[in-house]
Curated annotation (Swiss-Prot):
Protein family membership: Belongs to the glycosyl hydrolase 1 family.
Lineage: Eukaryota, Viridiplantae, Streptophyta, Embryophyta, Tracheophyta
Lineage top rank: taxon: Eukaryota
GO biological process, one term: carbohydrate metabolic process
Active site: E209, E423
A molecular function GO annotation: beta-glucosidase activity
Class of enzymatic activity (EC top level): hydrolase
Enzyme nomenclature, EC number: 3.2.1.21
Catalytic activity: Hydrolysis of terminal, non-reducing beta-D-glucosyl residues with release of beta-D-glucose
Protein name in UniProt: Beta-glucosidase 19
Glycosylated position list: N236, N241, N424, N429
Organism, as annotated: Oryza sativa subsp. japonica (Rice)
Binding site for a beta-D-glucoside: Q63, H163, Y353, E423, W464, F480
Amino acid sequence: MCGCASGEDAMETRRPLHPLLLFFSPWLLLLLLLVVQGVRSLQFTRDDFPDGFTFGAGTAAFQYEGAAAEDGRTPSIWDTYAHSWRNPGGETGDVACDGYHKYKEDVMLMNETGLEAYRFTISWSRLIPSGRGAVNPKGLQFYNSMINELVKAGIQIHAVLYHIDLPQSLQDEYGGWVSPKVVDDFAAYADVCFREFGDRVAHWTTSIEPNVMAQSGYDDGYLPPNRCSYPFGRSNCTLGNSTVEPYLFIHHTLLAHASAVRLYREKHQAAQKGVVGMNIYSMWFYPLTESTEDIAATERVKDFMYGWILHPLVFGDYPETMKKAAGSRLPLFSDYESELVTNAFDFIGLNHYTSNYVSDNSNAVKAPLQDVTDDISSLFWASKNSTPTREFLPGTSLDPRGLELALEYLQEKYGNLLFYIQENGSGSNATLDDVGRIDCLTQYIAATLRSIRNGANVKGYCVWSFMDQYEMFGDYKAHFGIVAVDFGSEELTRQPRRSARWYSDFLKNNAVIKVDDGSVSTAFHAQL
């Protein structure tokens, strides 16, 4: 999660040049103008983004909807986790923002803010309580009604099919994502969503951050479904195998995703004219030193962070780095599966917050028993002076240059992919006068524009999140919303923060944003 240094609003009008410049020769004046505009600052408005680019904000079903046991919804693996002793904060998503009952007023608030797009997730266990089979009419009614409200408001809809909320019934029946049985069940669930909502939803994302959930849910067991094995798990897992299950989870996620994409293309795309993509978590990584070992470790980390998902989707197989590291523990694609996953996407969604430094830890591969962390054989540093860890650090440092470098890397490595920035924001400021969040969003929106001007094919940007909601890390104490929610009030009162008014001014009034080009990235590297 990114934290941002405080400062004044980045909105301001264009200032006139100093009169003394008029005394310089035309050539020198031109040079000075280039320095001012190209190096020291960047000024832009909403209109500087390409046609078809959309700005929005997001929420997620478990974190927003509440009504956990209402109108036929059954528990998901996230419900089970939230109600267990493994949940360090003890809070649950039983009520959350009560979006299940308050979505109409929330859509009105989105419209007032000027959102052009809204990214939300669908609860599988609300729509199909048993995980397969009969559709819950109440769940269907809820999503149809919310989608209709968004359509009436003229807000582009970006729907996500899965976000850490597998129906618990499927987890109990066959182990969920570690079983190949989940592939057909997910495709059938996706088909219901495409059929019922696809006449109004044109942007579909199958899964959020599987590259992170593999390690957190199936290696160290920290997140749902809390599977791990000794000696790797952080928690006292009773089920799991940290050496192989992260790889099985990703393998079946890719096959489920690709099956849903093929189904959409064969049954729905011609009539609905929508697109389907997958989301990945996308930190950027710098080598800790210029040593050959640290540089190689950084490239290895990128293969695990990005290539684990993108290499199969683009080339039909896992990166050679992963094959060498994991050996027989990494599943093989059959010829049919390789053909199925290759090019099985129309876009890639990126969740981007911060950057890490990386150093080599090749001694990890000498362990008699290895997990994914050992296979990566690297250490992660939030700063050059921090204590390193074996797993990447979400961090609190702002590094918009990292987003630019990530997009540049992905374009060079995997071709001219179409991207949506589906999450970016800050959870560090609970006040209504959240100037720090404005600074954060300003810098990352500017980085997005710079990337586009440098050739990246980015079509949208979503703030995380539209309103405060239940968070996996921090429960209700993390405040990512540009709209504040008073979780202590019975009405769960919403109140736009200063960042919401700033975002609205940018989107509705084409307000000018001025950014000191690179200044925040410079500060990031200075503190490291």
